[in-house]
């Protein structure tokens, strides 16, 4: 049993049909693998040409031509659906990850052969319809992925070198405004449908995902991202401190304490209290207490993983926040994400920018503004260094397991 790295590419058609959330939910909850990388892609013609060459060299029986034709006709910027060729690249890590992910996805089979595929992603979302003389009438694989470790290594190396050469952010795919959503760390503490189901709920807005990145906020990023909350806490929490002082000191002294005196005492405590509450939020988002982080380590990635997504479309900021719900899950409207998935005002499922200006500020802090970073490439390259690149010819990889 070895720790493996594998990938899933969600096709442009699956993205356009808002199937992304459900696909991610199944992969994360059923595979027992960790989602360690994510990136939007718009393949170039050169990338598609090489991808086709690789698939052809596998000599996959039965489904090979249909797959080649699909890649050729659907992944190019000029395609038969006349839509943006956005794909979503997902990177998974885990014990026997290639086989586990493939089991969740399912095989490429015709409608008449699909009995064994029930319950899989392809059993739900893919189509492979043929005529009586076995000509392909309609083909949609839903996702693309490797079926054995050697082919995974080979193609991961290919993606790392040629698949992530642009920004990974495609705001030109839709008119309107762009807003930032962060699915918070508690959604990733265990393998769960939560992240995927939340993405599925956001999809009901009709907005498009135009960028994505797995993030580990550093202490410095966390403090910059949430820095404004220190003043908010000082203003909002002072009345609560006054009330607690009144309650705690009631009957302690044989003299009257005035309102001004309670306010003066609260002022002394207020700064410390605001700093504590602020540190708790940063600790939750990063996994490290900023007070305990040495200066030399403040820019190092934190311990907690979160998922940052860019949504774009008309009135994106307001639309996303309406779907998310108010800060406190206890009073959030039923049917909102925070009502369904939030626990308290800190662990409230997700963050969403409250203005276009703040979306820009926050995107710059987490590194999802000019580009989506090089995380996927770095993860792949580091894994290949430890586990070795592909030493097997593509035809031999095909012989081991067959279809994609």
What is each residue range found by the language model?
Residues 1-404:
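Non-catalytic terminal and connector segments of soluble metabolic enzymes
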């Amino acid at each position: 049993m070895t720790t493996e790295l594998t990938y899933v590419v969600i096709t442009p058609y699956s993205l356009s049909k808002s199937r992304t959330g459900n696909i991610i939910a199944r992969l994360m909850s059923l595979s027992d693998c960790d989602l360690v990388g994510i990136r939007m892609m718009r393949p170039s013609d050169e990338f598609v040409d090489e991808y086709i060459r690789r698939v052809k060299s596998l000599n996959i029986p039965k489904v090979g031509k249909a797959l080649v034709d699909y890649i050729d006709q659907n992944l190019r910027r000029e395609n038969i659906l006349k839509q943006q060729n956005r794909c979503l690249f997902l990177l998974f890590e885990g014990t026997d990850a290639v086989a586990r992910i493939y089991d969740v996805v399912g095989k490429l089979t015709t409608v008449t052969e699909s009995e064994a595929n029930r319950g899989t992603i392809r059993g739900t979302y893919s189509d492979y319809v043929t005529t009586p003389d076995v000509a392909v009438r309609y083909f949609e694989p839903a996702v693309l992925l490797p079926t054995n470790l050697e082919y995974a290594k080979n193609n991961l190396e290919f993606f790392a070198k040629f698949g992530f050469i642009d920004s990974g952010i495609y705001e030109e795919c839709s008119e309107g405004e762009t807003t930032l959503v962060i699915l918070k760390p508690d959604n990733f503490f265990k393998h769960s449908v939560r992240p995927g189901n939340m993405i599925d709920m956001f999809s009901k807005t009709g907005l498009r995902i135009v960028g994505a990145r797995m993030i580990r906020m550093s202490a410095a990023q966390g403090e910059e991202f949430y820095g404004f909350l220190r003043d908010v806490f000082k203003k909002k929490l002072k009345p609560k401190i006054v009330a607690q002082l009144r309650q705690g000191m009631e009957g302690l002294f044989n003299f009257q304490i005035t309102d001004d005196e309670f306010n003066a005492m609260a002022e002394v405590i207020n700064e410390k209290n605001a700093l504590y509450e602020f540190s708790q939020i940063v600790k939750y988002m990063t996994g490290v207490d900023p007070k305990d982080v040495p200066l030399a380590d403040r820019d190092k990635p934190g311990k907690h993983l979160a998922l940052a997504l860019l949504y774009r479309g008309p009135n994106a900021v307001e639309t996303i926040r309406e779907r998310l719900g108010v800060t406190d899950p206890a009073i959030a409207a039923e049917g909102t994400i925070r009502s369904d998935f939030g626990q308290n005002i800190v662990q409230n499922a997700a963050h969403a920018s409250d203005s276009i200006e703040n979306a820009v500020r926050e995107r710059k802090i987490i590194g999802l503004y000019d580009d989506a970073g090089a995380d996927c490439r770095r993860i792949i390259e580091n894994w290949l260094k430890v586990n070795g690149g592909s030493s097997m010819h593509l035809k031999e990889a095909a012989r081991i397991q067959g279809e994609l």
